[in-house]
């Protein structure tokens, strides 16, 4: 599984994303520039320039027409992918930590930071696809403020039909909101309860690729969790030995990929084994760790799995994107119980 190394960012990666077809990779970093790459060979297609601060998040709509970026420069920008033109810029009161399109492309959520005396929010914008895409509303159609009894929201995403917004919080809780009214529905603690770690901030939420009926979370408490979207029930816990920054679910195979590592200031040497800078593969059902992939020389900040399940991309603190395509041994791997079940099914047929 030889990786393709994508070099184009001058500073640490903050997020990587595939489009729905999987032929493009979108990446953002602390260098204020977004990049678009061909996933087949790692060639850079172009850049999106206009931010003046760290870009924390990027998302692309389901039709690869528009993408959105959220930045520390207090703006959200909407881009026309074909030309690289910025068609809209929204000013926000605080840095924007996460952006995500709804499944039907009609809305965009943005998580803003709780700093400078401002309350953190989840803001929802209606997206207009008419004409040249520049006729966007200047204000959000919905603002969900952080509840007085809750810690700030760090990440958020949409349920399968866009009816709900699932948010991860600084204290390890996940919450569920009605995406039309902003009504709070329920919350549950999923991190900060599995070990003695005091810091339990949720760093990533990604949805199941097949039906979005459950999410995988990553947290600074050195764990990742599988959580049911309908009930917020904790389904599985994957325990690691370093803070986790990102987690993703693979289609085809029942695996979860985790990424993270010790922060640079806490690592006494630059060896990747010391900092635990590997992508970790766990069996989704049996929760066993089944392998690691090395390569980065700093924590992994973002992992995205190819929509077809044929590979994954990781963005690191070292400023590199590593694109891996799985070989035959990956697809052939089975636990004994899986092999036995398959044999029984074949004999019954």
UniProtKB/Swiss-Prot annotation:
GO cellular component: eukaryotic 43S preinitiation complex; eukaryotic 48S preinitiation complex; eukaryotic translation initiation factor 3 complex, eIF3e; eukaryotic translation initiation factor 3 complex, eIF3m; nuclear periphery
Keyword Protein biosynthesis in record: yes
Intervals holding WD repeats: 8-49, 51-91, 93-135, 148-187, 197-239, 295-336
Annotated GO MF terms: RNA binding; translation initiation factor activity
Keywords in alphabetical order: Cytoplasm, Initiation factor, Protein biosynthesis, Repeat, WD repeat
SMART domains associated with the record: WD40
Quaternary context: Component of the eukaryotic translation initiation factor 3 (eIF-3) complex.
Entry function: Component of the eukaryotic translation initiation factor 3 (eIF-3) complex, which is involved in protein synthesis of a specialized repertoire of mRNAs and, together with other initiation factors, stimulates binding of mRNA and methionyl-tRNAi to the 40S ribosome. The eIF-3 complex specifically targets and initiates translation of a subset of mRNAs involved in cell proliferation.
Family affiliation: Belongs to the eIF-3 subunit I family.
Name used for this protein in its record: Eukaryotic translation initiation factor 3 subunit I
Gene: TIF34
